[in-house]
Every structure is written in C-alpha cells, then in structure tokens.
Amino acid sequence: MASSIDSHMTESTADSESESFSLTDDEIINSILDILARTAPEIRNGLPGRRVKTNEENPSGESPMEADVFADELLRNRLGSLDGIGEYASEERSSADDTGSGLSVCIDPLDGSSNLKSNAAMGTIAAVYDAPLPARGSDLVAAAYVLYGATTTMIAAVEGNVADYVIYQDGSYEPIEQEVRVPSEPTVYGFGGRVPNWPRDFNSFVSDIESDTSMKLRYGGAMVGDVNQVLTYGGIFGYPALTNAPSGKLRVQFEGYPIGYIIECAGGASSDGSQSLLAVESNDIHDRTPVYVGTPSLVERLEGALAGKADSE
C-alpha cells in the first residue's frame, strides 16, 4: 500500500536487506512534500470546471485561468497553515504572504495551464528556501514538481537526491524510482518561445540539434512536462532569451531555481546561457531568466554556442 513520504523516507523494509530510501530527516520539508502530493488529486479533480480565464490580472499582466486561482488558493491554505512556513509566494500573487516564521515556499500553482483547453499535460512547481524572499539559488533546501499527465507523479529533490513518486486518486503515494538520474546519452529536445524571436546564436544551436538524427523533438507547452521528458530520456529543454524579451519568460524564484536544482541534483546541468541557474541573481520574486536544463554535454554546447564559439561541440 502507498503511504506518506515521511514513512517512505524513514521506515525500514522488513523483507529487505537495505533500509528504505530517505531524502531528508527534516520534518517540515517532509510535511511540505506530503501536502503537495496529497493536494494533487484535489487540484486535478478541480480542473474540469475551471477551464476558462478569469477577469483578473496576475503580476505577469495575464488573465489567469480559474484553475490557476483555484490551485493557488488551495495550496496557500494548506501550506500557509503549516508550522515552520514563514512566507508563501506564488506566480498569481504580487507579493509574498507572511505566514509566520520559518522556511519560504514559492509555488507555480499550475504550470502550463494554457494546456487546459487542449487537455495536455500541466503541473505544479514548488521551491523551498531557507531564507526570506526573494531568495538565492543557494538558499534552496528542497524542490519538487507534480506532473498531471496520464498518471499523476511527483519529482522531489532534497540534499542532492531526487526521487519519483506516483500519486493515487485517494491522495496516497509511493516511490517508483528512488535515485533519479539524468541519462548521459541525450535523445530528446524541446525549446520554447516563437522562432522568429530567437537570437541568432541560439537558432544556430537548435539547427545543430535538429540535424542530429538521434534526437527527437518533445515539446508540449508546459515546462514540467518537457523537463520530465529530459529527466526520463536525457536531452535538453530551453526557454531562451528572446529578441523581444531579453530576460526570457520563466521566473527565477518559481521556475528557474527549482527546476535547475532538481536537474542538478539528478546529475544534469542548468544554465541561464552562461552560468548555473542557481547562480542567477534575483532581487524580486517575479524576476525572469532564460532557462536551459539537461544532459551536461548539451548544456555545455549551448553555452559555447551562445558565447559565440565557432566549435561548441
């Protein structure tokens, strides 16, 4: 039977010579992950009746879907009431909510919510910082994302370890892989943004990737789904700086830091084009950054291409 993350991380398996896998002994982090997992079926069940836009405007100047607001409020209520959480911030809120004292949590409640209409994959991203917001990448103590795909799963990263969980309809869950690693041989790629707005050096890099017959395009319009392809099969995902958006589209605190942390904990690499995503400076919770993550050899090639090196392979 499935049980809580805390029990999966700490209990001994009676019929096994080895102890069960443990991400952390920190009870607060375990509780955060537990809430994310147990809330996932409620978010998923709430999607069908919330597939239209609201009349509101979020900090990005966009009209969120009703599902975005629903997921945000649900997670705010659950996480904000947890002892040991000092701040709750989300992409849908202009500023962080003061919830007491302790860790800071940044949430992208429904990454890829534009996929609701086409019924494609989407997810929830969480970053946990041991510092006030806006935090630094070095302040991360845990990160996770829930993927609402054919099944509901959660990738969780803590202390250099990454585990994959399947989440059942009743909110229970169990690990399906306890030491997730980015495959060393890349096979998939996916890049966001309109092609006419790609910088020339990035466009050239993409052309080189596309000419490799061993590589397959996997892009679905929700970063968590595309990143999960890379985490599963090896490869590269990127949302570049654009000619009309030099800082890119994705947000440092909600997407860049946590996804970079997860991929690096799994043995992959992350970059903003010249350095690790975890080294990016952020002075506002809604700061943006270009995002590139994946197999280290490809991320290194990308950085070389963006630096104008003639031979980045």
Swiss-Prot record:
InterPro entries, per database record: FBPase_C_dom, FBPase_class-1, FBPase_N, SBPase
Give the reaction(s) catalysed. Answer: beta-D-fructose 1,6-bisphosphate + H2O = beta-D-fructose 6-phosphate + phosphate
- Major subcellular location class: cytoplasm
Q: What Enzyme Commission number(s) does the record list for this chain?
A: 3.1.3.11
Gene name for this UniProt entry:
fbp
Q: Listed GO molecular functions?
A: fructose 1,6-bisphosphate 1-phosphatase activity; magnesium ion binding
Any single biological process term in GO: gluconeogenesis
Any idea which positions bind Mg(2+) 1?
A: 91, 108, 110
Similarity field: Belongs to the FBPase class 1 family.
Protein name per UniProt: Fructose-1,6-bisphosphatase class 1
User: Pfam families, per this entry?
Assistant: FBPase, FBPase_C
Locate the residues binding substrate. Answer: 111-114, 219, 249
Stretches of Acidic residues bias are at: 14-23
Self-association and partners: Homotetramer.
Polar residues bias: start-end ranges: 1-13
Annotated Mg(2+) 2 binding lies at 108, 111, 255
EC top class, in one word? hydrolase
Pathway per its UniProt entry is: Carbohydrate biosynthesis; gluconeogenesis
Q: Region labeled Disordered — which residues? A: 1-23
UniProt entry keywords in alphabetical sequence = Carbohydrate metabolism, Cytoplasm, Hydrolase, Magnesium, Metal-binding
Protein species of origin: Haloquadratum walsbyi (strain DSM 16790 / HBSQ001)
User: What is its subcellular localisation?
Assistant: Cytoplasm
